[in-house]
Amino acid sequence: MWAYETTFYQIYPLGFCGAPRENAAPVAEDELAQAANAAPNPDAPIMKIAQWADYLQELGIGAVLINPPLESDSHGYDTRSLRHIDRRLGGDADFAAVCETLHAHGIRVVLDAVFNHVGRGFWAFRDVQERKWDSPYKDWFHISFDGDSCYGDGFWYEGWEGHFELVKLNLQNPAVVDYLLESVRRWAEGFGIDGLRLDVAYMLDRDFMRRLHTFTRELKPDFVLIGETLHGDYNQIVNDEMLDSCTNYECYKGLYSSFNSVNMFEIAHSLHRQFGGDPWCIYRGKHLLSFVDNHDVPRLASILTDKSCLRPAYGMLFGMPGIPCIYYGSEWGIPGEKGGPDGDWALRPALDEPAPNELTAFIKQLAHLRSADDAAARALNYGAYRNVVIQNKQLLFERACDDATVLVAVNAVGEPYAFGAGELNGSFVDLLADDAPTVELTGALELAPYEVRYLLRA
């Protein structure tokens, strides 16, 4: 699967493109369809993503994960239409042009798909509001006419986790499933998307995910499905019948927390529990989506108590098993915290142009290591995980496949450190050093403050 050898880059388009936070009043589907037939507009806000294509290609990005760009009430997850691009961003032709530009740069497109719920402005829900019992769409939702909603609709309905601006879809209704699958087909044929990120996949009907898996594989044999999951056993949905990957929130927490508490035992425990060589390790052979921040959680530059740990944190991210995903702007360390008057929008700012710095150059180096067609990339993308030396302030682990072994050494503090281990004997290619020289080690390895080293056994 191509995704297992790729660095992802996440863009939240409504924020990134500076769109208004609230949409205009809902319009009929046919009116959206008419606007969709217009020619591409080079000044459409969504075209900003295409303008970053050269930068993303140079950075080593192989896929862009685009959070919901479809017509919605406000933040994208309160969908009005699953068939057309949000008017605040542009039109369907504009998004098709964005996808074409990304593909021309060798970058695949994964769309954030919201199948668990829709917004109150969703066309079928508005029909129920108007026609009540007589609406042919009343069974598309979990509705009772024996009660009332907090909005006074004249009926009760189930919202997502108590958020009644998000109306839960009935995924056991064949008509709903057919509508969703037809929407996916249109995205694949009209935009050429290469995969989906499934919002709140942990809540989706399992039979629906099985059918989606079969349907998308028929569209494109290498179509990737990545689910949003928080806790629990990821094997329940990441398997041969459902999803290819899911978000690794366990290791997300372990990454920043290990640096903040100066306790590398935490992330080492999580990584071994998930990917280690013991029979009880639970995700061996799986490729989970790894990240240090995203559109729902504080930026790494804000959550780290020691900002000098940005570099070793990204070194850990790219060295551990999984699919690394960078959230736009974090590659040069922009801050962002939840709460305050802007709420989650503070995590989703408009950015005019890239502002690369030394951190960006380091992440670029890491991304290109992962995407290379060589032994080191195979070890980093597919190699087994093994802890070698664990200290509170330092961690040395191994990624090994049939033809390559890479040692990843991380120093989480502002003082030098010398590792000692039998695995540090022999010749190694110092992958992150200038010109990647071969070094001879005799059981010890020196690390500068906050340094990360990747050593390929020669």
Name each model-derived stretch.
Residues M1-L65, E71, A96, T101, ...:
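Carbohydrate-interacting/catalytic domains
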Residues W2-T7, Y12-G62, P69-G190, L212-E218, ...:
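Substrate-binding/active-site clefts of carbohydrate-active enzymes
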Residues T7-Q10, V64-I66, V109-L111, L196, ...:
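Hydrophobic faces of well-ordered beta-strands that scaffold small-molecule active sites
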Residues L14, P69, V114-N116, A201-M203, ...:
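Active-site beta-loop-alpha junctions enriched in small/polar residues
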Residues G60-G62, H105-I107, G192-D194, K220-F223, ...:
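Short, well-ordered coil/turn segments that N-cap beta-strands
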Residues H103-H105, Q129, E189, D199-I282, ...:
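Active-site-proximal helices and loops of the catalytic beta/alpha 8
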Residues V110, G195-A201, L300-A301:
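Short catalytic-loop micro-motif centered on adjacent basic/acidic residues
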Residues Y283-T305:
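Active-site clefts of carbohydrate-active enzymes
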